[in-house]
């Protein structure tokens, strides 16, 4: 199977790969003239590309006409995740990309145990993890990780951009299947779904009320208690299954 790389430098039947990926292809993989790879432009379009030349830190290609990526789901999913301790957020990002998430937005809430520290530096690492996961699993877009929102109020103020907001709460709520069936996307657009899950301490009752007032639909996650790094992935898996994106 051809190796996959992301580049935005694709036009008029040619393409250029630069930086670390160019080094990987030319020095690590020992690519040769005439070898074929798959290039992705980050907007769900892929190209079959043939190596035509090497520069100091570049690889040049001729490319065939682009075609839609088969790996992209029919829904646009954003994970809003209560900021967890240690490397749990890295796990959520890595596996969330594999499952089809497009956006990740960490946030701090009342019962978060983790405290803000070196967030810009961490954000660079998180986006790199998303980038590598997207390459590994064959995604046609580059999922992004935002800087964390400072409190749950900021989360609620950001929710009007979505067609469906799922607030995951231990007190339960409406069936997920029903909520997905009732949600309607804008004409010609993917259904935009936001999934909100808590950190280790869960949510305060006031935060659940804030989410409901902001239009979020409360959903339960079954009779078992899920860890904060398990819950978001469980919901994403359920959403992808119910929308036909894991078939």
Identify the residue ranges that each predicted region occupies:
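Glycine/charged-rich beta-loop-alpha catalytic/anionic-binding loops adjacent to active sites
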Residues: 15-17, 74-78, 190-194, 212-221
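Structured adenosyl-cofactor binding patch, chiefly the S-adenosyl-L-methionine
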Residues: 205-247
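A generic structural signal for short beta-strands and their flanking turns/coil linkers
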Residues: 13, 33-35, 45-47, 57-59, ...
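RNA substrate-binding interface of SAM-dependent RNA methyltransferases
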Residues: 70-167
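Hydrophobic side chains in well-ordered alpha-helices
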Residues: 25, 89-92, 207
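Active-site/ligand-binding-proximal alpha/beta "capping" segment
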Residues: 162-208, 216-220
């Amino acid at each position: 199977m051809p190796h996959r790389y992301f580049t935005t430098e694709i036009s008029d039947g040619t393409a250029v790969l630069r930086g670390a990926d160019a080094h990987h292809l030319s020095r690590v993989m020992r690519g040769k003239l005439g070898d074929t790879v798959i290039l992705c432009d980050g907007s769900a379009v892929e190209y079959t590309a043939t190596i035509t030349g090497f520069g100091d830190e570049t690889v040049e290609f001729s490319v065939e006409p682009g075609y839609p990526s088969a790996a992209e789901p029919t829904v646009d999913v954003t994970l809003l995740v209560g900021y967890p301790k240690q490397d749990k957020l890295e796990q959520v990002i890595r596996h969330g990309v594999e499952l089809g998430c497009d956006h990740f937005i960490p946030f701090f809430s009342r019962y978060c145990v983790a405290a803000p520290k070196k967030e810009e530096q961490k954000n660079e690492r998180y986006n790199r993890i998303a980038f590598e996961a997207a390459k590994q699993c064959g995604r046609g877009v580059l999922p992004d990780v935002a800087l964390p929102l400072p409190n749950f109020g900021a989360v609620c103020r950001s929710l009007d951009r979505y067609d469906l907001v799922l607030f995951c709460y231990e007190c339960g709520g409406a069936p997920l299947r029903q909520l997905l069936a009732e949600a309607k996307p804008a004409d010609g657009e993917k259904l935009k779904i936001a999934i909100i899950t808590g950190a280790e301490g869960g949510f305060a009752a006031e935060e659940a009320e804030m989410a409901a007032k902001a239009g979020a639909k409360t959903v339960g996650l079954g009779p078992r208690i899920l860890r904060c790094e398990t819950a978001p992935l469980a919901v994403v898996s359920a959403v992808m299954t119910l929308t036909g994106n894991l078939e």
